[in-house]
Structure formats: structure tokens, C-alpha cells
């Protein structure tokens, strides 16, 4: 399992630990990933995604998974999230036409 957020693309960063004596040692900054189940209102289904805590806050702030994915750019999303986004856009377009 890769350490990348499925919704924002947040991944592992590298840097240095810097001591008081200014000694530098390599380290990794890992994203705060959580396995969560999010509900799509348009599709009436639950989806299990691996997202960062910041992405989870963004989903809540935008009003749910559907609103977040519609506003998100496709190049940040994982392949699963892109497919889900296309399905949501298609379903909302059908609902608007009906």
C-alpha cells in the first residue's frame, strides 16, 4: 500500500532532523493517513478510501464526498477517486436533466 492520500495526492516528503549542534540526519515526513468510509449521496453507496486527516477535514468543509470530488482537479486524485468522480458527475447530470 503506498503512502499517498487518494483525494489530495499528499505523499511522503524527505528532509532533515536538525539537532541543537546543527547536525543533520535524513528523515521522512509521513502523511497522516486514515482508512475511512465515506458516503456518496448521489450514488447511495459507501466507499472505503485512504485519505489524509487534512483531506478528511476538506471533505467535511465542502459538504461531503460528492461536493469535494466535483470541485477537485482530476490530476490530484487517485485512479479509484477519478472513476468515482466521473460516476458522480454523470449521475448528477442525469438527475439535473430529469
From Swiss-Prot:
GO terms for cellular component: cytosolic large ribosomal subunit. GO terms for biological process: translation. The keyword Nucleus does not apply. GO terms for molecular function: structural constituent of ribosome. Pfam families: Ribosomal_L28. Disulfide bonds: none annotated. Keywords: Ribonucleoprotein, Ribosomal protein. It comes from the Bacteria. InterPro entries: Ribosomal_bL28, Ribosomal_bL28/bL31-like_sf, Ribosomal_bL28_bact-type, Ribosomal_bL28_sf. Belongs to the bacterial ribosomal protein bL28 family. This is Large ribosomal subunit protein bL28. It comes from Rhizobium etli (strain ATCC 51251 / DSM 11541 / JCM 21823 / NBRC 15573 / CFN 42). The lineage of its organism: Bacteria, Pseudomonadati, Pseudomonadota, Alphaproteobacteria, Hyphomicrobiales.
Amino acid at each position: 500500500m503506498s503512502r499517498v492520500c487518494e483525494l489530495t495526492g499528499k505523499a511522503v516528503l524527505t528532509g532533515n532532523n536538525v539537532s541543537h549542534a546543527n547536525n543533520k540526519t535524513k528523515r521522512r515526513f509521513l502523511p497522516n493517513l486514515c482508512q475511512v468510509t465515506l458516503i456518496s449521496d448521489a450514488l447511495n453507496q459507501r466507499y472505503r478510501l485512504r485519505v489524509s486527516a487534512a483531506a478528511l477535514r476538506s471533505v467535511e468543509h465542502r459538504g461531503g464526498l460528492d461536493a469535494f470530488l466535483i470541485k477537485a482537479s482530476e490530476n490530484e486524485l487517485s485512479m479509484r477517486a477519478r472513476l468515482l468522480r466521473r460516476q458522480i458527475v454523470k449521475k448528477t447530470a442525469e438527475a439535473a436533466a430529469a
